Amino acid sequence: MSADMSFFHLISGASLVVQLVMLLLLTVSMVSWTMIFRRRSVLQQARIAADEFEDRFWSGGDLATLFREVTAQSEHAIGMAGIFQSGFNEFARLRKQPGADPRAVVEGAQRVMRVALSREMDDLETHLSFLATVGSTSPYVGLFGTVWGIMNSFRGLGTANQATLQMVAPGIAEALIATAMGLFAAIPAVIAYNRYSNDVERLINRYDNFLEEFSTILQRQAHV
């Protein structure tokens, strides 16, 4: 209990600038943790959805039937299902045109799927740049608070008749808390950014591989 009181006493006794730095780092840390948990849920759902759709796609069923099933679930599907939905819809539309060139039909479907893939990339990478920024800047913000606090401590020595450790220790301790809070905000953000960036890259590779495989299937169907 005394340690907790001492900790909060140091924070309450810090200078206004150091307190503002601590408040900023605490706020950033809370926002960062919120985004970490949200991104974890989003990426986990995206992996599960991709697994389920691939099972349905490669089950050997009719593509038109699969398209109707996907569209019945959502007119604007996301993930791998969204890429399939966009591509097959464009393929069917272009193929109905009189005198449609099979190559042009497939290329049109590929362009639409590339656009859908780009949208999925943007959605998957949402908030990752924020985590990267938190991870790279928080230690420096904390260091700024530490330097400011130490400057105040040594400034106080200038007006003292006798310099003692007891006089500067509280100021240095409260200043170092800012550095600790900066690291507390930065370390989880860096770990999450590296982990989620890897997860996003693997998902995008899966989407891209599916796009190429689906394009090959459409090429065969276009010449039927």
For each feature predicted by the language model, list its residue ranges:
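Alpha-helical transmembrane segments of multi-pass membrane proteins
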Residues: 25-28, 190, 194
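Alpha-helical transmembrane segments of multi-pass inner-membrane proteins
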Residues: 23-24, 169, 177, 181
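Hydrophobic membrane-targeting segments
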Residues: 1-55
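Hydrophobic alpha-helical transmembrane segments and adjacent short intramembrane/lumenal linkers
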Residues: 161-175
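Hydrophobic alpha-helical transmembrane segments of polytopic membrane proteins
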Residues: 175-191
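Predominantly long cytosolic amphipathic alpha-helical stalk/bundle segments
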Residues: 48-141, 150-164, 191-224
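Residue-level signal for the membrane-embedded core of alpha-helical transmembrane segments
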Residues: 21-31, 138-141, 145-148, 183
